[in-house]
Amino acid sequence: MALPNAAGEPAHRRALWAVLDTPWGQWPVIGTHLDHRFDESHVRQLQVDAISDLVLTLRNDPTADLPVLIGGDFNAVPDSDEIRRLTGRTAVKNRNVVFADMWELKGDGSGHTWSDRNEYLANANWPNRRLDYLFVTWPRPKPLGNPVRVWLAGVEPVGGVQASDHFAVVADVLTERSGDSNE
């Protein structure tokens, strides 16, 4: 799905989605990479709104269906308007579509995915920020999709090669329903 540019028109940034066949049922996942310019928060807000709209199409009943897992390079720090919009800390576009930040729930430390420990960022303008995320939608049947643990991958070079200029965020999530109410 093409994500909007500053004019609200489809642009080169994308959200790629799939519905995976799992032992627990059909599990929707989305991967994305939002605009990167420091001064384009307004564009990223349009882009996260488009992702919120996509989530609505992937779930028939948010209180019964498996939650949507969303990951990617959001190019925004946790207190930015676009991340606050996703996590319900400011007005959301769609009622019943809020995203829980897995690093915030179970990560350890700062979670910097754009780090000066990465050789590709030796001359970066603004290193040591958390720009990459894994989210799980709310509401959802408790505790489906809750992170058990969250960590960074690709932190160390392998065979002298750094995998990317960003570290990856990885999570183990709960896959069984508890029968409790949706909270």
Model-derived segments and spans:
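Short alpha-helical segments used as structural interaction elements across diverse proteins
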Residues: 10-11, 41, 127
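Histidine-centered divalent metal-coordination motifs
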Residues: 33, 73, 166
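His/acidic metal-ligating clusters that form di-metal
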Residues: 17-30, 41-84
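Hydrophobic side chains within alpha-helical segments
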Residues: 36, 47-50, 135, 168-169
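A short acidic, helix-capping loop that chelates divalent metal ions and anchors anionic groups
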Residues: 37-40, 111-113
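Metal-dependent phosphoester-hydrolase catalytic domains
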Residues: 56-68, 76-183
